[in-house]
């Protein structure tokens, strides 16, 4: 359930994408029927059915893939055999983490999109769950704390596009290598191998940003967010923070932990405006959205 700090109203939790059906079997001409389709995957159809007999006709084709705009700018929904959240691929022809891609012809030009899996991305989970806004859109400048290997960073880069920039900070050198490799082709990503607790060490690399997102899973993450906002977030800018309850306090109920973290964010000079749980995609996680010096 979501929680709106302004009105007290909640946002309904998002429904997980349904598993798609397997592919149909082939239609026989002289011989027996083709094999049944495989089971559906997390985001849609499984393997197609087996072919018909020697002279068998092909099975019917699935529904045409259609891309429609999501209410959040720069985010899209793929409608076809299954429904999925997608972003427009900044570097067509290549996946980042073996995610599914699809091409759609738009105004005589083929545009490639990538599936944005809410089980692999907390921002995607928040979008599917009904968050009011993420304030990340084409042209945005984003500071991403806890970039890991770049799974979600790559989708944020898709959204902000060539006129935006994503400064991605990651402490782990192992994950950082993957992040750096991803950024070689996504030129709007600036990878920074550093400690998010020490923003002064990368202040010469990062400009003022529109949004700060943090997914650092540390007990002092509210303080980490506060420091980075003071250094880099524009007045009137926005922040998003993913809170993993057990990383803060494993002895308390998640709701109690979330409430305490919201209070800490307020003490850092931030203004929390909405809280959203990330079930069923992430257990005991919440996303908090807010503004800074608005």
UniProtKB/Swiss-Prot annotation:
Record's keyword terms, sorted: Methylation, Methyltransferase, Nucleus, Ribonucleoprotein, RNA-binding, rRNA processing, S-adenosyl-L-methionine, Transferase
Catalysis performed (reactions): L-glutaminyl-[histone H2A] + S-adenosyl-L-methionine = N(5)-methyl-L-glutaminyl-[histone H2A] + S-adenosyl-L-homocysteine + H(+)
Entry binding sites for S-adenosyl-L-methionine: 151-152, 170-171, 195-196, 215-218
Coiled coil residues, start to end: none
Sequence ranges of Gly residues compositional bias: 20-56
EC number: 2.1.1.-
Any one Gene Ontology cellular component term annotated for this protein: small-subunit processome
PROSITE patterns with a match to the protein in the record: FIBRILLARIN
GO biological process, one term: box C/D sno(s)RNA 3'-end processing
Broad class of where this protein is predominantly found: nucleus
InterPro entries with a match to the protein in the record: Fibrillarin, Fibrillarin_CS, SAM-dependent_MTases_sf
Enzyme class: transferase
Any one Gene Ontology molecular-function term assigned to this protein's record: RNA binding
Post-translational changes noted in the entry: By homology to other fibrillarins, some or all of the N-terminal domain arginines are modified to asymmetric dimethylarginine (DMA).
Entry's localization field: Nucleus, Nucleolus
Annotated spans, Disordered: 1-62
NCBIfam families: PRK04266.1-2
Main function: S-adenosyl-L-methionine-dependent methyltransferase that has the ability to methylate both RNAs and proteins. Involved in pre-rRNA processing. Utilizes the methyl donor S-adenosyl-L-methionine to catalyze the site-specific 2'-hydroxyl methylation of ribose moieties in pre-ribosomal RNA. Site specificity is provided by a guide RNA that base pairs with the substrate. Methylation occurs at a characteristic distance from the sequence involved in base pairing with the guide RNA.
Subunit and interaction comment: Component of box C/D small nucleolar ribonucleoprotein (snoRNP) particles. It is associated with the U3, U8 and U13 small nuclear RNAs.
Similarity field: Belongs to the methyltransferase superfamily. Fibrillarin family.
Identification of the protein by name: rRNA 2'-O-methyltransferase fibrillarin
Species: Tetrahymena thermophila
Gene name tied to this protein: FIB
């Amino acid at each position: 359930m979501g929680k709106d700090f302004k009105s007290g109203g909640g946002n309904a939790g998002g429904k997980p994408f349904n598993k798609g059906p397997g592919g149909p079997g082939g239609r026989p001409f002289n011989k027996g029927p083709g094999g049944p389709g495989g089971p559906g995957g997390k985001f849609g159809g499984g393997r197609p059915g087996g072919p018909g007999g020697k002279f068998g006709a092909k099975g019917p084709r699935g529904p045409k893939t259609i891309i429609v705009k999501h209410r959040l700018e720069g985010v899209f929904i793929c409608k076809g055999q299954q429904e999925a959240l997608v972003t427009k691929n900044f570097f067509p022809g290549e996946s980042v983490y073996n995610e599914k891609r699809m091409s759609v012809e738009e105004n005589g030009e083929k545009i490639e999109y990538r599936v944005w899996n809410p089980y692999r991305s907390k921002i995607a989970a928040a979008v599917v769950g009904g968050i009011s806004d993420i304030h990340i859109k084409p042209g945005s400048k984003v500071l991403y704390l806890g970039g890991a290997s770049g799974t979600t960073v790559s989708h944020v880069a898709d959204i902000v596009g060539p006129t935006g920039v994503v400064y991605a900070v990651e402490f782990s050198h192992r994950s950082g290598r993957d992040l750096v490799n991803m950024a070689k082709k996504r030129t709007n990503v600036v990878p920074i191998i550093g400690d998010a607790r020490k923003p002064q060490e990368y202040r010469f690399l990062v400009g003022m940003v529109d949004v700060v997102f943090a997914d650092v899973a540390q007990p002092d993450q509210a303080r980490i967010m506060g420091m980075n906002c003071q250094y880099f977030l524009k007045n009137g800018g926005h922040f998003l923070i993913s809170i993993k309850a057990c990383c803060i306090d494993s002895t308390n109920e998640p709701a109690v932990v979330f409430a305490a973290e919201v209070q800490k964010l307020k003490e850092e000079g931030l203004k929390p405006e909405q809280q959203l749980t990330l079930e069923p995609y992430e257990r005991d996680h919440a996303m908090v959205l807010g503004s800074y010096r608005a």
